[in-house]
C-alpha cells in the first residue's frame, strides 16, 4: 500500500502538467484541429501522467520522456491543422483573433480599449515629435543621423473608432527602415462617432499638406500607406488629390483596405462565415453580405467613391501595392480597386495571402506570412526610392 501511494503523481507534477497542456488544448481548440490532433495530445498527456512515479521515471529519462511527449503533441497539432497550405502559427493566430473578436463589445468600448496611454519610446537611432494640425495630431518619426529625401504618411486602421496605438508606431519604424530611412508621419485623426465623415478625410488631407508644404517634401517623394480604415483614407486622399488636379504621391501601400462600405463585393458573402475578424456564425448566415459592424455610413451614399474607394476610378494613379488575406470579407474591396486600377493601366499589384485574416501584417515577423508581406512591402518601397 505504501509503495502504491509513493507512485501517485505529486500535486506539483499535476500542476506543471496542466500548466503545459492547457495552452496546448487551447491552441487545438482555436485551431479547430482534426480529431487525431486531440487524440495525440491526450495520449501524450496520459503517457506522462502514467509514467510519473514508475521505477524508470528518474534522472535523464525524465527529460527524454518529456521531450518525446511534447514532440508527439507538436506533430499531432501540425498534421491536424485544417489547411496544410497555411503555416501552423498563422492558423493558431487566426483562431486567437476569432476568439477575441467573438467576445461581446460595443464600438465605444472597443475604441477606448485601444486608446491606452503609451509608454513606447523610439528605438536607438530614432526620435519622435508630435505636431498639432488644425484638428488632429501628427507623430513624426525620423532617424537622428539620417537625411532622407523621402517621407511616408501612415494612416492607421481601426474602423474610424479606434485611435493611434503602439502597433502603428512599430509600423512606422518598419516603414522607415524599408523606405530609405525616411521620415514617417503617422496621423492621429479624429474618431467617429463623435466626428462623422468626412472629418477623418479632412485630417488626412491636412497631414498630406503639412508634409508637402510645411516640410517641403515633393509629392513624388511621399508614399501614403494605410491599413483597413487607414487604407480607405489613403485611397480617398489619392482620389481627392487627383480630382483637384494636384500632384499625387509616389505610391500607395494598402493593407486590407476597408474600401467598400456598401459590402457589395462577392467576398462579403463567400467569406462571411470564415473571416475570424468580421465573420458571423454559420447558424446566423442566410446569404446576407457581411462586413465591418459600423454605423459610419448612416445617412450617406455608401457607394460614393470618396467614402468607398472601391467605386472610384484610378486613372493617372502612381504605383500601388494592395495586400489582403484570402479569408477576410474585405478581400473583394481590394479586388475591386485592383481591377479598376489595372483597367486604367496603373502599375498595381494585389497579393492575396492564403488563409490570412484582416491586417495580418500586425503580427510583424511572428508569422511566416506576415514576414513575407513585409518583405514584399520592402521590395515595393525600394523600387520607389530609386
Located regions from the model:
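Alpha/beta-hydrolase superfamily serine-hydrolase fold, recognizing
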Residues: 4-52, 63-108, 114-386
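Amphipathic, cytosolic membrane-interfacial segments at TM-TM junctions
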Residues: 56-60
Amino acid at each position: 500500500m505504501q509503495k502504491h501511494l509513493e507512485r501517485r503523481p505529486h500535486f506539483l507534477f499535476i500542476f506543471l502538467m496542466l500548466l503545459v497542456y492547457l495552452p496546448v488544448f487551447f491552441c487545438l481548440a482555436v485551431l479547430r484541429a482534426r480529431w487525431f490532433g486531440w487524440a495525440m495530445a491526450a495520449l501524450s498527456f496520459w503517457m506522462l501522467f502514467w509514467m510519473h512515479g514508475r521505477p524508470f521515471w528518474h534522472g535523464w529519462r525524465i527529460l527524454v520522456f518529456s521531450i518525446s511527449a511534447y514532440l508527439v503533441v507538436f506533430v499531432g497539432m501540425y498534421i491536424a491543422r485544417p489547411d496544410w497550405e497555411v503555416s501552423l502559427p498563422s492558423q493558431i493566430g487566426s483562431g486567437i483573433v476569432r476568439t477575441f473578436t467573438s467576445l461581446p463589445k460595443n464600438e465605444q468600448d472597443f475604441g477606448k480599449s485601444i486608446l491606452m496611454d503609451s509608454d513606447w519610446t523610439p528605438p536607438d537611432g530614432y526620435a519622435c515629435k508630435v505636431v498639432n494640425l488644425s484638428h488632429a495630431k501628427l507623430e513624426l518619426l525620423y532617424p537622428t543621423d539620417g537625411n532622407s529625401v523621402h517621407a511616408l504618411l501612415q494612416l492607421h486602421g481601426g474602423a474610424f473608432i479606434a485611435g493611434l496605438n503602439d502597433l502603428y508606431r512599430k509600423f512606422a519604424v518598419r516603414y522607415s527602415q524599408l523606405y530609405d530611412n525616411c521620415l514617417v508621419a503617422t496621423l492621429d485623426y479624429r474618431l467617429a462617432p463623435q466626428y462623422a465623415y468626412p472629418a477623418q478625410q479632412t485630417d488626412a488631407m491636412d497631414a498630406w499638406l503639412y508634409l508637402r508644404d510645411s516640410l517641403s517634401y515633393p509629392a513624388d517623394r511621399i508614399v501614403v500607406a494605410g491599413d483597413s480604415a487607414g487604407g480607405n483614407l489613403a485611397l480617398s486622399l489619392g482620389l481627392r488629390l487627383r480630382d483637384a488636379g494636384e500632384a499625387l504621391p509616389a505610391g500607395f501601400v494598402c493593407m486590407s483596405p476597408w474600401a467598400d462600405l456598401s459590402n457589395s463585393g462577392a467576398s462579403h458573402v463567400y467569406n462571411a462565415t470564415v473571416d475570424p475578424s468580421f465573420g458571423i456564425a454559420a447558424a446566423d448566415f442566410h446569404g446576407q453580405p457581411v462586413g465591418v459592424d459600423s454605423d459610419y455610413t448612416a445617412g450617406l451614399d455608401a457607394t460614393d467613391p470618396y467614402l468607398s474607394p472601391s467605386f472610384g476610378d484610378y486613372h493617372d494613379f502612381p504605383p500601388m501595392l494592395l495586400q489582403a488575406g484570402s479569408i477576410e470579407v474585405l478581400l473583394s474591396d481590394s479586388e475591386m480597386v485592383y481591377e479598376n486600377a489595372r483597367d486604367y493601366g496603373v502599375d498595381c499589384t494585389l497579393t492575396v495571402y492564403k488563409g490570412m485574416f484582416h491586417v495580418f501584417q500586425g503580427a510583424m515577423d511572428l508569422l511566416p506570412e506576415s514576414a513575407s508581406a513585409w518583405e514584399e512591402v520592402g521590395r515595393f518601397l525600394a523600387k520607389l526610392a530609386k
